[in-house]
């Protein structure tokens, strides 16, 4: 009996479990834990852009995935491979989410990699972009 081919969801289609996510139709994870899959981003904004994808859609798995991205970034800093990193998540179409399964973006940063490195304040057009702490 032939095995049933998984149905992968397209951008903006509801995803019921991580196995339906488009990431598995394109690639295999580069790392995996009990809670998280890690993929290279297919459309990276910089070299080293990774996606930390929780295996379940709940706060415990999402939190563990965030923690893994944070630890990964700190290891890269300690190794001298990067100077800093951004870790973030777009939740909901209005926030820029296209794959409707939670996933955390890890973006490595280097000194002077951007004229204006910005931060979260630059994400919203009506924000006060002059305020720095």
Give each language-model segment a name.
Residues 1-133:
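HIT superfamily nucleotide-processing domains
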